[in-house]
Structures are given as structure tokens and as C-alpha cells.
UniProtKB/Swiss-Prot annotation:
Gene Ontology MF terms in the entry: aminoacyl-tRNA deacylase activity; ATP binding; catalytic activity, acting on a protein; proline-tRNA ligase activity; transferase activity
BP GO terms, sorted: prolyl-tRNA aminoacylation
GO cellular component: cytosol
Reactions listed under catalytic activity: tRNA(Pro) + L-proline + ATP = L-prolyl-tRNA(Pro) + AMP + diphosphate
Organism, scientific name: Caldicellulosiruptor bescii (strain ATCC BAA-1888 / DSM 6725 / KCTC 15123 / Z-1320)
Protein name: Proline--tRNA ligase
Gene: proS
Entry remark concerning the domains of this protein: Consists of three domains: the N-terminal catalytic domain, the editing domain and the C-terminal anticodon-binding domain.
Amino acid sequence: MKVSELFMPTLKETPSDAEIESHKLMLRSGFMRQLSSGIYVYLPLGYRVLRKIENIVREEMDRSGAQEVHMSALMPKELWEESGRWAVFGPEMFRIKDRNEREYCLGPTHEEAFTYIVRNEISSYRDLPKILYQIQTKFRDERRPRFGVMRCREFTMKDAYSFDIDENGLDISYQKMYDAYVRIFKRCGLDVKIVEADTGAMGGASSHEFMVPSSVGEAEIAYCKACGYAANLEKAECLDEPVENKEEPKEKQEVYTPNVRTIEELVSFLGIDSTRFVKTMIYKADDKFVAVLVRGDREVNETKLKNLLKATDLELASAEDVEKITGAKVGFAGPIGLSIDVYADNEVKYLKNFVVGANKTDYHIKNVNLSDFKVTKFTDLRNITQDDLCPKCRSQKVTIERGIEVGHIFKLGTKYTQAFNCVYTDEKGEKKLMIMGCYGIGINRTAAAIIEQMHDEDGIIWPITVAPYEVIIVPVNVKDENQKKIAFEIYENLQRNGVEVLIDDRDERAGVKFKDADLIGIPFRVTVGKKISEGKLEIRNRRTKESFEVEIEKAIEVVINLIREEKAKYQI
């Protein structure tokens, strides 16, 4: 492809609304443009990258024995009502009506559609197991689209679904997908951490996320450098470590704390360490209110709480509801005398003479002990921190960092097959529910995550496996007929050898061409300049920034070998 003919509208300046590097660089490099909030158009270079990622995904899914299908993005309400998720999925689902007032949704995910098809088409154990997948557009009405394609309203996803006769079969399918994902992200050049995850609204027994460590990631992950344990913050278990506390209970004391509501304000006002406080948080779980107690320096893990209560919806109670329940304004809630269930984090068991809200505006109570109130249940209800030991090996404190989720796999069990009565007949003639797994990869997000991991001050550094082109030929002066002739000879020869190659034949300064080549991230640049008079040209590696000269007649062989060696680094 000639750059003079390529639709590549690069930008010198970074758009003001782009917050993170991947968003900035995808716009500056002419890879995409925004059509509306959270909706993007992919231009030729960007679309080539997405197609390459899709092809890697497709190859590894096929290699694992999965079969590709294509579902409709438009799904009827009745399908989602059958699973019970029409109301549960919430405002993120795009819902529409046709001219006859029939309701549909634009698919945010496709469990319902796949289960429906399999239920209708497979009835015998002889036809199982099956793993079906698609690479499809998904739609989610994000409240606040941000970070470019990291959180957008329309995106491409590979979603796969396995159907097995039993849990052992699911384990095999799950491992196949796990291994395929490892290969996919290796081939895409991504450094990923595989972490235990909560199953969330997807349901099911167990789950893993494939996370790309990044400061701009929306999720936090905890991992152990000693044993390799890794989990996202929602899932990471906090050890119940008994603490010997020989303090004698003291007499309770009500303290006037005017307009002092937060732990930070209380620490300053009372001169007491935050570990001596117990926070009382009032939540609404579906239609029920509960109180949750955690130590003053801890944060409630709402996922753990939601799972404990088996709640569909969980949110902090409104200020009005807090006042009705406690008799006090927000900031002064405490566990003493509450008429609702009180759940406490395990750490609270070992505290004595702590401070709580008095359920009286502008007052707290010092020297409170467990005997002063009733706890419905003690359990793990807090977020893990870097001061906590690894829950697996217990030998080292965990490390916590942010990450970008690029893949997620679930053991769904019978959540959807039961709802759809998706059964098979076994060898004894008995009908049994199929066991499901589901497996997703965000294609657009994978591209953005690659950029987040691989860029510098000059632009993107694409791994050769997903780069839009492998080589760019740059004749320094296209008005020099000799330079132009040699550049095009190399270009055409590389094309004949199956190399994906650009030639920058624009009548531009060499500096402009070099900057664009670096910006769009082409792995190798071949510069045809004045040195051709000596029979030489220059080859530059975008990733290492190393340059070297080669003889013109050896250039094709050298470039092909460089590409072969570079590709080998991403094979598994």
C-alpha cells in the first residue's frame, strides 16, 4: 500500500478529550474517530489491527475445537424473560420496540441466544460436548463512556459457550478455553495476569479474569509474588487471623462530635487511631436493609456482601433511609440498638473498646464492645490491602495494582440451562441438564491494552503479530529517481514474498515520514537515502530503536529474516 493513497489522517496535536495513552494514540495515529459518545469508527489502519486480533482469536478457538457461529445482535424480550434477566440486567441494556410495539434488546451478551439454539438442536449425550463461539458486536448503554474503547457503548467481543454432560466435562472445556486464552494473549504480545474473579451477574461456580497490569485499569488485582496467587479485589479473600486482645472492657462513653462524620475527621477530632473505630454502613439489598461493620481503616467489599445476601441489587441506603433506621443523620450510624440484621467483618471479632456512631446526630460512643450489640454473622466483608498476607500461602503480603480486563471465563453450571430447560438424554434414557461455561474476549479493549503496554513518546509500538503492516519503506527524497526506483523495487519484492508492506511515497520531508512511521507503530522501517550511492540502506527496529545498514542486494533477505525472528517471539 502506498501511503499517498492510504486513508491515514494522523494528528499532530492530542485531542483534549482523550485521557489515556491508548485513546490519544488511536486518535492521533488515524486508527479511529469518534462518531458519538462511546461510539467509534475504525479507519483502515485501526481496522487492520482489529482484524489481526480477531484472526489470532479465531485460529486459537478453532485449534481448541470450538466452532464459529454468528448470532443476531437483536434479540427478543421473551428470550431474556425466559432466563429472568430482562429486568435484572438494568439500564446498561439497550431496549427497543419495533413498529408493532414488540420489545427487543441489542445484545450486551449472548448466553440466552446460545442456550436457546442448543436446547432446540441438541438432545442426546452423543452430540456433546460442544463449544460454540462468535465474534460479534455488543452494545451496552454505559452511564459514562470513557477512556476511548476501554469503556464504550458499542464494541466487538469474542464470546464462546461450552455445553457438557457433567462437571468433569465442564472442567475439560474450561481448561481448553483457559489454555487458548493464554496462547491468544501471548500471540498478541500482552503481559497478562490470570486472576480469580467473582462471577457477578453472569452467575456460576468459578471464574478467571485475564488482566493487563496498567495504571489506567478500572479493576484492582491482588497477587502474591511468592506463590503466584492472584485475584481481583472483589474476589480476594481476607484471612480470618485471630488477634489476642487482653484489654479489659471499659465503660461506654458518649462523646459530642459536632458535624464530625468521616473516619479522617474523627481521628483528628478524638486523637484516636483509625483501627480503633468500627464503621457502620447501612445498605439496601433488594428490598431489605442491613448494617455492615468494618474496622475504621477498612472498606466494605460490596461484592462479598452481595453474594452473602444473595442479593440481585445492592446499594448504600439513602440519607433519608439511614435517618429512619438509625434516628441519626449520615455519619453517626452505629450498631447498638439497631432493629435490622448486622453483619460484621471478621476483624471486628477481635476488637475491644472501639468507637462507633451513637445513632444520634453529632454523637459517637467510645469503649464499645461486642457484648453491647448483636451481630447476625461474622464473615469476610472487606477489601484486601497490601498489609494483608496472601490467603493461599500465608507467607508474604500481597501486592495490589490496577489492571485492564481483556478476557473473562466462567463456569456457569446450570444457571441458564435450567432456566431454558436445556436438557440432553443420557445413555440410560434419562433427561439431564447440560452444564455450561462462557468465555469472553474484548477485541477493541485488547487493542487498547496493547497500546497501554507498548508505546513511547513517539507513538505506538505494535507487536508484529497485530501491527497493521510489518514494514514501511521510506524513500527520503521521492524526487530522486534512483531512491524512488530502489524503494519501489524493494517494496514490490517484499510484497511478492508475502510481507505486509507500506511505502511512504509522499513528497514530504523525511522527518515527517519518520514521525508518522513511529506514530503508527510499524515494526520495521527501511530507509532509502543518500547511502544508496554506496550500495547501502538503513533498517530500523521500532521496538528497540536500533538501526543498522545493509547492502541493497541483501535487504530483502535481511528484512524477511527479521520478520521471521520477530514473529517467533510471539509463538506458543
